[in-house]
């Protein structure tokens, strides 16, 4: 009975994630200036139960404001931070760094970096594809849709995504977003 219940929960998560992925391709974007630092702190508070009892060193730098849809960007940050928590689980001392790269006038480059299990850069281009997993499902839960959703949301904002990692040394996921609202629009589809 437990196996059936677990399978039903996993199927429910998969369906929810697929619906979210589909919505992110169609949903109107409500553009405004978004304070990423504030969003990060909100997301970390929401994920506190996942971090409870763990030894995690958080290193959060000042983050810029960008033009974007606050709800969608919250989903991006929630996915990236949840992944950092998940993939540092085997570490007795996890380190999660959230910051931005300097020097870009037209775009803000924000990253989430961890000292988790990492990945082989040979597969970096697959990381953002739907249903792509670089680790076995038995090791780390997930549906393989989260980073595909991140890429879709960032692309809809006129941005880009990429990743860096090394096996057993951690990973960094980068998102580049326009600093200003694009074209002064309030809604964008």
What are these regions (language model features)?
Residues 4, 146, 150:
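Short alpha-helical Gxxx[C/S/T] motif in the catalytic ATP-binding
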Residues 84-88:
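Short helix-loop "hinge" at the ATP-lid/N-box region of the Bergerat-fold HATPase_c
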Residues 119-131:
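Short conserved segment of the HATPase_c
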Residues 158-164:
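Glycine-rich ATP-binding loops of the HATPase_c
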């Amino acid at each position: 009975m437990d196996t059936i219940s677990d399978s039903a929960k996993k199927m429910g998560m998969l369906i929810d994630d697929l619906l979210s992925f589909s919505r992110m391709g169609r949903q109107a974007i409500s553009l405004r200036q978004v304070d990423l630092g504030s969003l990060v702190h909100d997301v970390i508070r929401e994920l506190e139960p996942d971090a409870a009892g763990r030894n995690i060193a958080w290193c959060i730098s000042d983050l810029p404001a960008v033009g974007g849809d606050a709800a969608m960007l919250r989903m991006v940050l929630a996915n990236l931070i949840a992944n950092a928590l998940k993939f540092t689980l085997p570490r007795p001392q996890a380190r999660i760094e959230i910051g931005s790269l300097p020097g870009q006038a037209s775009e803000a480059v924000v990253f989430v970096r961890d000292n988790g299990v990492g990945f082989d850069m040979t597969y970096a281009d697959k990381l953002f594809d739907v249903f792509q997993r670089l680790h076995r499902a038995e090791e780390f839960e997930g549906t393989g849709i989260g980073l595909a959703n991140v890429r879709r949301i960032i692309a809809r904002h006129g941005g880009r995504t990429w990743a860096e990692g090394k096996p057993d040394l951690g990973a960094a996921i980068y998102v580049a977003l326009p600093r200003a609202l694009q074209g002064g629009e309030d809604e964008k589809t």
